[in-house]
């Protein structure tokens, strides 16, 4: 959520920033609500001043033992004034609720370093690591490799649950588990605290990280009692410190979390229908940071390097891309996408998204900290990134390490977890 004081003081500046993101916001509605809010506040202040003055007069008259008729008349007037005041205060609450709702639909403001652009075609490549894999045979897609090896079963998963689901079997299931354990081990060795959170969360948690109210159509919801299945561990892990005031000495806090994730993929009709790239249920290892504001952009670079390290150790070619203003996520001030090379598709595909939200999520979730030698509190900055998406990493291994005979070489760092060198 944006700072309401900034929104009130800088509507034109905000409109310009959001135009860069491709958001068309009706600020006239907001300004109209603000004008009405200010009028109601003045009226409330005036009536409260009258009430205080008359209350003092009544007390004074009682002290002087004045006639009851005068006192009763003033009391009756105050009763009527109280009813009017209650009605105006109710109107003010309704206006403030509308203002709050308006703020909940406003995206974050892009950082000055974010490249300008309309969509993903104008994202900017920052760096590459490794050379795209080349073969002396026609490389297969991961779904063909998985079915030939008998380690992925899409057909039976479809029978059980429908499209966009998969069953991992045998060495496929073991590879998935090996990747989870490898990533958790790697990140905890770097100082991240492992967290295993609930995968069902309440509405307040979803609102705190920015999924609600704007993206409800992409969430799986349980109606009674009301819960949401998490689309990413970002949601429960960020909400660990919701409504808390941390000390400066506690920061930075680094968490790593493995969870299943669930997404409707409502806007993805016809995209990646085959394979593991876009599933309703998938596993992911997530990195989440709580940091001081002045450190957050250095922490974003560090977070991105931590995600990159996974791919380097697995020997998977990748590139890092800075998202342009038009492709930036709703809550993000700046994002790097890490894209891994997939020979079966002949292109790079996103495997991690590393973002700095500045204080956007912290305002929504009310996560603050207190400096050692300073009064008051400040909002922390939150960051997160995939470290990595397990299914897409498995896809990259199958496609980059495939052999002419249909087997797949196991990356060296995974062999202690797998107990084998080759999947046949």
UniProtKB/Swiss-Prot annotation:
Name of the gene this protein is made from: serS
Catalytic activity of the protein: tRNA(Ser) + L-serine + ATP = L-seryl-tRNA(Ser) + AMP + diphosphate + H(+); tRNA(Sec) + L-serine + ATP = L-seryl-tRNA(Sec) + AMP + diphosphate + H(+)
Name of this protein: Serine--tRNA ligase
Pfam families, alphabetized: Seryl_tRNA_N (PF02403), tRNA-synt_2b (PF00587)
GO biological process, alphabetically ordered: selenocysteine biosynthetic process; seryl-tRNA aminoacylation
Keyword field: Aminoacyl-tRNA synthetase, ATP-binding, Cytoplasm, Ligase, Nucleotide-binding, Protein biosynthesis
Organism from which the protein derives: Thermodesulfovibrio yellowstonii (strain ATCC 51303 / DSM 11347 / YP87)
Binding site for L-serine: 232-234, 286, 386
MF terms in GO: ATP binding; serine-tRNA ligase activity
First-level EC class: ligase
């Amino acid at each position: 959520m944006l700072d309401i004081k900034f929104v009130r003081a800088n509507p034109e500046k905000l409109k310009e920033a959001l135009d860069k993101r491709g958001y068309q916001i009706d600020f006239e509605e907001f300004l109209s609500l603000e004008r009405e809010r200010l009028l109601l506040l003045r009226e409330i202040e005036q009536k409260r001043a009258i009430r205080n003055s008359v209350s003092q007069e009544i007390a004074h008259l009682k002290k002087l033992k004045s006639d009851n008729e005068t006192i009763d008349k003033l009391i009756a007037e105050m009763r009527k004034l109280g009813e009017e005041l209650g009605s105006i205060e109710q109107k003010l609450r309704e206006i403030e609720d509308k203002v709050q709702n308006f703020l909940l639909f406003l995206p974050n403001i892009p950082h000055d370093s974010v490249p300008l652009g309309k969509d993903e075609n104008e994202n900017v490549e920052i760096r590459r690591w490794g050379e795209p894999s080349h073969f002396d045979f026609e490389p297969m897609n991961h779904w063909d490799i998985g079915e030939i090896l008998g380690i992925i079963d899409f057909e039976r998963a479809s029978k059980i649950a429908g499209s966009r689901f998969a069953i991992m079997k045998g060495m496929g299931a073991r590879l998935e588990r090996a990747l989870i354990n490898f990533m958790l081990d790697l990140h905890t060795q770097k100082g991240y605290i492992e967290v295993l959170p609930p995968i069902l969360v309440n509405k307040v948690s979803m609102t705190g990280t920015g999924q609600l109210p704007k993206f409800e159509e992409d969430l799986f919801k349980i109606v009674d009692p009301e819960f949401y299945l998490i689309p990413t561990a970002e949601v429960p892990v960020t909400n660990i410190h919701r409504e808390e005031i941390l000390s400066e000495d506690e920061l930075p806090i680094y968490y790593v979390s493995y969870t299943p994730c669930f997404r409707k993929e409502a806007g993805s009709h016809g995209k990646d229908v085959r394979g593991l790239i876009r599933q309703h249920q998938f596993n992911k290892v997530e990195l989440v940071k709580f940091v001081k504001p002045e450190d957050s952009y250095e922490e974003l670079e560090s977070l991105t390097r931590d995600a990159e390290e996974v791919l380097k150790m697995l020997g998977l070619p990748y590139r890092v891309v800075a998202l342009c203003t038009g492709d930036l996520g709703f809550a993000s001030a700046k994002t790097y996408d890490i894209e891994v090379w997939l020979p079966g598709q002949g292109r790079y595909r996103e495997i991690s998204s590393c973002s700095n939200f500045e204080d956007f999520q912290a305002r929504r979730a009310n996560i603050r900290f207190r400096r050692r030698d300073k009064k008051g509190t400040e909002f922390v900055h939150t960051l997160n990134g995939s470290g990595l998406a397990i299914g897409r990493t498995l896809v990259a291994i199958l496609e980059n390490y495939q052999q002419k005979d249909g087997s797949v070489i196991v990356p060296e760092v995974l062999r202690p977890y797998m107990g084998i060198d080759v999947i046949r």
